[in-house]
Amino acid sequence: MRIEEIHLYHVGMPLVYPFRTSYGDDDAIESLVVHLVGADGEGWGEAAPWRAPGYSPEWAYAAFLTVREWLAPQIVGRDVRSGADLRRHLAGFKGNPFAKAALDTAWWDLDASARGEPLWRAVGGVSPSVTVGADLGVMESVDRLLEAVEAVQAAGFRRLKLKFRPGWDVPVVEAVRRRFPDLPTHIDCNGAYTLADLPMFRALDGLGLAMI
């Protein structure tokens, strides 16, 4: 698949609820969007490493620059035959997994488009749709969180992920599970704990969480 053109977009989107986690606060999300154009189709990819290097060493604008200045010139005008072939073209640059992932997902979409196949089937999926979940961060109060959970459930979300950090932990999850016992719920700690905290995690065993 010859890559004829690459178009890059650095985009931002305000969040409905501010996102507070163990590594900081955000009221918007930024991402890199990649549009690949080939002779027989086009593909779109995205990477969203946030707008500051708090979650990872990469951030959205840095990923945009990395693709524009270094990665895109390695593949424009070249025949990229597979995902593995794409990785070989980019192997000379260390790290930058978000920037590379944006190109990788766009290549898979381009390849599926050229073959007239939906992307979900091309990558081995078994269904054209998936259950959508909501992700809620630390809030001003448990009551505010419960209101937010009720709102996202009413909007059609069927799974829930909660941010979890010291001071916003077991009692918060207990309150959510009491109010919404049938809503599949995950928690995400973002590296805020160590092995010394295992006893606290055992306290979650009876809450029926889908995943930690």
Regions from the language model: what does each represent?
Residues 120-212:
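Metal-dependent enolase-superfamily TIM-barrel catalytic cores that perform enediolate-based chemistry
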Residues 1-10, 84-91, 112-113, 117-129:
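N-terminal amphipathic alpha-helix/helix-capping segment at the start of soluble metabolic enzymes
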